[in-house]
Each structure stands twice: as C-alpha cells, then as structure tokens.
A protein has these predicted regions:
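Acidic, serine/proline-rich low-complexity intrinsically disordered regions
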Residues: 4-247
Length: 247
C-alpha cells in the first residue's frame, strides 16, 4: 500500500495530467471517531445542517474540504443504508428497483472525504469526476489485462456504487451520476464518476504517465474535420494489406 504522501502525489498528477476541474476525492470508511482528522467538517455539529453524501463529495472536490459524515449528518437515506449505518427498514427492500451493494450493518460509523492531493489519511477508494473526454483518455491508458476489470453502473444510487461496490468487488467502476448529484450537488451535465480502489491507484498512474507520450493523451486532444486526414503508419499498413491504398 502506498504512503499518504504517495497518494497525495497521485492526486496532484491526476489533476495535472487530465486537467481536472475539481480534485479527485479520497474516501475512507470510518470505524471509530478517533480516525477523524483534526479540522474535518462535521456538518450537523459545526454548521447546524445536514448534507446528502453527494453534497459532501461536491464540497470536497470543489471547496477542498475534509468532511466526516456520521449518521446524524446525513439527509438522504440511500447512503445511510448503503454504508451500513442504519438497519434496512422492515418489510421493504430499498434495493429492489435499482440494486446496489451495502456494507454490513454496524461495520462502519461514518465516511471521511478529502481532496486526494491533501488528504491526511490513506483512502479506501478514490473517486474522479471528469468530463467524458478526460475519462476516455484515462481508460485508453489501461493495459489489456486491466480492461476486463472495468465495469459500469448507470442507475442510482451513485454514492453507493462509487464507494461500496469498488471496496467489495474490486475493479474499476465508471458511474453515471444519479439525479441527486445533478439536482443537489450541482454536478455538470457532462461529468462522469470513476471509482478506483486505493491499492490500484499507483499502478493506474504508471500507465497514465506512459500514455502521455502517445497521441491520445488528453492534453493532445483537438477538434478537426478533414477528409484524407493524416494517419499513423499502422493504419496505412492495414489499408495496404486490404488492397485499399489506391482508393
């Protein structure tokens, strides 16, 4: 497992390489209050209001806030149930319509978030908010052996899929932000979420840094509409093998 400083450096590199508008979010599930760093915001205690978890993610990535959300800080039931902070209601299955993973009840007392580049703790999961072009560049940097590990979740609740799912199942997760992300946390319409288990992050950065030397790196993206556009040599060879070089 990487050190805290190494995780911080990963956060800096992700922002720089992908030109991210907001900070990747370091997420740690809490088993005891002693793990809450000094200065972390407790919404109900410190500001006398509650937040949905998507709003806490938004404040962390935009305002660079470290936030600890215990059950008394939450204002949306999905995260409380998914993170195992409350028992599932009797007589109903809240996961029936849009299935999602949940931690065992009582395993965790809360969730801690901070910008990855300044987090004072080792995360369990890192959530990257990006536009679709940034996400494409990130995914294209993956090696062939990693591609089968990329999965997607496209239904609510994204707060569960971005935290519980990668922790329980491993792998990489592309997540469509749910309505709460848009309506309450002010997620841009073009943004996607990408969740990475913390132990996979250093390797992801190795591949992403190597990818910067190739033409598909995000900073090399540009728009153009041109017939007979310049092609790489392997394109030319393929067309020659097909007998299409003279057409």
């Amino acid at each position: 497992m990487a050190t805290i400083k190494e995780f911080n450096r990963c956060g800096e590199e992700l922002e720089k390489i992908l030109l991210l508008r907001t900070s990747p979010v370091a997420v740690k599930m809490l088993t005891k209050k002693a793990d809450i760093p000094a200065g972390a915001l407790r919404p109900k205690k410190d500001r006398k209001y509650h937040l949905a978890q998507c709003q806490a993610f938004a404040m962390t990535r935009r305002e660079r806030a470290t936030i600890a959300m215990l059950k008394e800080d939450h204002w949306c039931p999905a995260a409380l149930m998914a993170y195992g902070m409350v028992p599932l209601p009797e007589g109903m299955n809240p996961t029936r319509m849009h299935p999602y993973e949940c931690f065992s009840y009582g395993k965790y007392i809360g969730i801690l978030t901070a910008p990855l580049k300044t987090a004072a703790f080792k995360p369990d999961v890192v959530i990257i908010y990006s536009n679709t072009s940034q996400l494409r560049s990130l995914l294209l940097s993956f090696g062939h052996d990693e591609i089968p590990q990329v999965n997607g979740r496209f239904f609510p609740p994204s707060c569960a899929h971005a935290v519980v799912t990668p922790m329980l199942k491993g792998g990489y997760w592309v997540i469509l932000p749910d309505p709460g992300e848009y309506q309450r946390a002010l997620c841009d319409e073009g943004e996607m979420m990408f969740a990475v288990p913390a132990e996979k992050l250093p390797g992801l950065l190795v591949g992403l840094n190597k990818f910067q030397e190739q033409g598909f790196a995000y900073r090399n993206n540009y728009y153009f509409m041109q017939g007979d556009f310049p092609r790489p040599d392997f394109y030319k060879k393929m067309f020659k093998d097909w007998g299409l070089e003279d057409y």
